[in-house]
From Swiss-Prot:
Residues 200-389 form the GMPS ATP-PPase domain. It comes from the Bacteria. ATP binds at S227, G228, G229, V230, D231, S232, S233. Catalyzes the synthesis of GMP from XMP. It catalyses: XMP + L-glutamine + ATP + H2O = GMP + L-glutamate + AMP + diphosphate + 2 H(+). The active site is at C86, H173, E175. InterPro entries: Class_I_gatase-like, GATASE, GMP_synth_C, GMP_synth_GATase, GMP_synthase, GMPS_ATP_PPase_dom, NAD/GMP_synthase, Rossmann-like_a/b/a_fold. Keywords: ATP-binding, Glutamine amidotransferase, GMP biosynthesis, Ligase, Nucleotide-binding, Purine biosynthesis. The gene is guaA. Its EC number is 6.3.5.2. This is GMP synthase [glutamine-hydrolyzing]. Homodimer. Signal peptide: none annotated. GO terms for molecular function: ATP binding; GMP synthase activity.
Amino acid sequence: MKDFTEQEKIIVLDFGSQYNQLITRRIREFGVYSELHPHTITVEEMKALNPTGIIFSGGPNSVYDEDAFRADERIFDMGIPILGICYGMQLMTTHFGGKVERAKDREYGKADIHVEKPNRLFAGLPTDQVVWMSHGDLVVEEPAGFEVTITSKSCPIAGIADEERSLYGVQFHPEVRHSVYGNELLKNFALNVCGCKGDWTMENFSEVEIAKIQEIVGDKKVLLALSGGVDSSVVGVLIHKAIGDQLTCIFVDHGLLRKGEADQVMATLQGEFNMNIIKVDAKKRFMDKLAGVSDPEQKRKIIGNEFIYVFDDEANKLDGVEFLAQGTLYTDIIESGTATAQTIKSHHNVGGLPEDMQFKLIEPLNTLFKDEVRALGTELGMPDAIVWRQPFPGPGLGIRVLGEITEEKLEIVRDSDYILREEIKNAGLEREIWQYFTALPNIRSVGVMGDGRTYDHTVVVRAVTSIDGMTADWARIPWDVLEKISVRIVNEVDHVNRVVYDITSKPPATVEWE
C-alpha cells in the first residue's frame, strides 16, 4: 500500500471558478487522484503534498484587481508541470512577464479555436476544436520563453506553452463538457505531460482509508449516523472493515424515511453484514420539534441538531465513544461553500451541527464524488440493492415536504415516491436515471374526480441524469412511463389530484427542492 505522499496526484488550486470541482472530477476519471486546495496554499504545504502536477483554476477576478486571488509565486519554481486555465493562464502570463488586458467584450459561451503549434497537451487531437470560453480579460503578449499555441477569432492568444519547463496555459475551460476535446486535453496533461500511470482505484482508496481509520481511532469507539442511504451505508461498511465491533451504528427512525426503509436497512446491514446497529424510534421527538416550522434552512438545522442530540443520548450509554462518523461527500463540502465560493445551501452533513457537539468527526468519503462512492461500495462487496439505492438526504422527507411538515403530507410523499420507484424499475430505467423522487410543493389546485370537485395537493416528480452530482439535466422519461406514474399517483394516493414533472437542470436549480 502506497503512502499518501507517494501516490500520484494532481493538485487543483481554487481561484474561485464555478467549474473548479469539475477539474478535479475529470482528472480522477483517468485513474489519477486529484484534490482541490485553496489558492492560499504555501509552497511548503504544496511540497508536503508531493504533487505530480498542478492546475490553476479559472476565477472571477482580473489579475490587476487590488484584491485579486494570488498564488505563492514560488510554486512556479517547483519544477513540476503546471496547467493554467483561464484566470490561471493569466496569472502565469503576468508572473513570467507577459501582458494581460481587459477584453473589449466579455467572451462567454462556445467558441472555435485553432491549434497553431501542437504539443504534448494536444497530442492526438484535431487542430480545430469547439471549446467553452468564460473570460473578461485576455493575454495580449505572451511571456518570454513561451509560444502561442492556440488562437481564436476574438482571442488571438488563447493558449501558451513553455514545453521545456512543462508550463501550459489555455484561455478556455477544458473541464466543461461543452469543450468537445476538453477531457482528452486534461488526460494528456495528466498522463503525457505529468507522466502519471493512471492506476488510482477504489481498491487503493479503501486500503488507504482503512489504514487511516485504524490509526486515527485506535482502540476507541465510533458512532455512525446511519440514515440507510448510499453514503452512510458505504461509510459504515468501510469503517466496520477497519475496526469491526468498535463501530456502533445509530439508526434513527425520525419519521421522515421512505416507505419500508427502516425494515430494509436493518435486514441488510445488520442481517447480512453483522454490523452493530442500535435503532432509535424518535418520530415523536422530531415531529414535535418541527411543528409549525416552514423555513427550509430552519428545518435542516432542527433535523441536524436533533440527530446529534439523539446520538449524544445514545453515546452516554456507551463507554469510550470519541468519534462520530458521517457520509459527507466532496459535493456536500463544495455546495456548502468554501473561501472562494458562495454558499448554495447548508448541507445536512456540514451545516446544522450544534456548537457543543461532544464528538470528533470522521468523514472518510469527503474527498469522493457520488459515482466514486458507488464504485467503493462495489469494491467493498456490497450488494447492488444498497450501492444503487436512490440518493437520500440526511433530513429525509423533511426537505421533500415544502413548508410545514405533517403526517398527512409525509404519507403523500412516501406513497407517491414508492409508486415512482416501482414504475422506474418496471421500465428498466434504474441505471439510466441518476436520481428520482417526488416532492410536495405545498400547492393545492382544483380538480374533478368522479362527479365531484376536488381541491387537493400537487405532487412534483423530479428525475435527473448526472455523472458526479455537480451538474445535472432533467431526465427524458418516456411519455408512456410518465403517464403510468401520474395515473397511479392520482388514483392510489389520497388527497392528490395533480402531478407535474420538473424539467429544470442543475444549475440553475439544485436537485432537491429545499
